Amino acid sequence: RKEEMIRAFAAAIADLGEYIVGPDMGTDETCMGWIKDEIGRAVGLPRAIGGIPLDEIGATGLGLTAAIEVAQEHAGFSLKKARVAVQGFGAVGKHAARFLAQEGAVLVAASDSTGTLADASGLDVAALIALKDSGRSLHDHSSGKKLGSDAILDAKCDIWIPAARPDVVHAGNVHRIKARLMPQGANIPCTLAAEQTLHERGVLSIPDFIANAGGVICAAMEYHGATQALAFQAIGERIRANTQAVLDEVRGGFQPREAAMRIARGRSMNAASSSTSCRHSDSSPTTSSSTVATCDRS
């Protein structure tokens, strides 16, 4: 039934030539393969058909880790032995935990749809990933305290990663966050009011479209024929640069999302200006192909 529905969706958007589909909550590499089969436009494809499986390799989690590496000094801690809590131990959260563990961080709490698992001395990230990959829940793990899903908000940690659903942190519960850094792994996981409260408390919140862009960057690289190695390189370079740009603005007095939006608007305006210049720089029939190519790349 799911395959039938996804193929029907693909057929419905067949004429939207600029709409390139990628995976998100509820879909995976196999689903993208069905869409590719129907309309020829999809990213995050299975390896078997030449794609880069975004969720399997943890592209978004890698990007989150890059953002955290840049932000750690600003937030006032060292990543090595930093305590991490992850809300939503799925395609994004589990890989973020894996990459952070490789950097010496310690996972002290994680949650999924069944509840929260916590251990102040540290949880075995590899064991939890194996558990989830086998179709079981965090509460099936033999160690750690089993708590309700909401208990993840109270985790004592340096890094609190929302990697589940939108609007999970809001005015009614933001006071429960006890972290120094919140890199947003999910899309819009924090309301604007809650972000402002965090900022006033000195908690650095890295906006979603900065911190969780690893999947989108990887998808764009895949679409243009890049290898996984090149995609990973691009994720690291771009997210580190974007995070640093936001932090530079924050030091100037801006709230993180305000800073990120200022940067995004500036780049969009520059891109639009460059595009207009390319279209109008020479309207004669003798415009060289090299000039057109240069404009296309800018």
Feature-to-residue mapping (PLM):
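Glycine/serine-rich phosphate-binding loop and adjoining beta1-alpha1 elements at the start
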Residues: 1-79
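Predominant activation on well-ordered alpha-helical scaffold segments within soluble catalytic domains
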Residues: 3-14, 32-36, 61-69, 97-101, ...
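General beta-strand structural signal in soluble alpha/beta enzymes
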Residues: 19-24, 43-45, 86, 109-112, ...
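Glycine-rich beta-alpha junction loops
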Residues: 27-28, 112-117, 211-214, 265-267
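Glycine-rich phosphate/diphosphate-binding loop of Rossmann-like nucleotide-binding domains
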Residues: 55-156
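Rossmann-like adenosine-cofactor binding region
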Residues: 115-205
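Short, intrinsically disordered C-terminal tails of secreted or membrane-associated proteins
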Residues: 293-297
